Amino acid sequence: MKPGTKNSYNSLSEIDIQGKKFKYYSLENAEKNGLDGISRLPKSLKVLLENLLRYEDDLSVTKKQIEAIKEWLKDKKSKTEIAYRPARVLLQDYTGIPAVADLAAMREAVKNKKKDPEKINPLSAVDLVIDHSVQVDQSAKSDSFEKNVEIEFKRNSERYSFLKWGQQAFDNFRIVPPGTGICHQVNLEYLSKLTW
């Protein structure tokens, strides 16, 4: 997802790490340039503020939304809605299958209007971990895990074929197959990135 076109608080900064330059949105610079007191915000609101600074465009993210985060310091509440854009979305199969079906339906609708259906893709990276359809059919044997996964693939072959199609059809979309682990474990051990 591309950053916004505005930089109202001159927070866009650059850091050099071992000769490689990286851009980031500095809360310290934003505080010096009009967002007084934001260093006192709770960490959770600092994450939201950095996200708003990154995507400020005067359309979906406005200066008013950014200032609402700062104003939270006064009353410890806000009625302003903000447009949070996560860098990545983690789904498990029960929420992911309907999402893929929605994307497929949107592509079909775009195609019916004689437009390019390939333009329909997730804006943020999506990782879908298939972990909620495993059932225990065999236990207490050395090959129980392998047998349960084999049965799982037979039982849900149509669903898995659909998800495999989705992974091939859409950009920014990865599938983690069943038998790999639960979504939170897989996320922490394999998928999550420290920086974007």
Residue locations for each model-derived region?
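Fe-S-dependent hydro-lyases/dehydratases of central metabolism
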Residues: 1-196
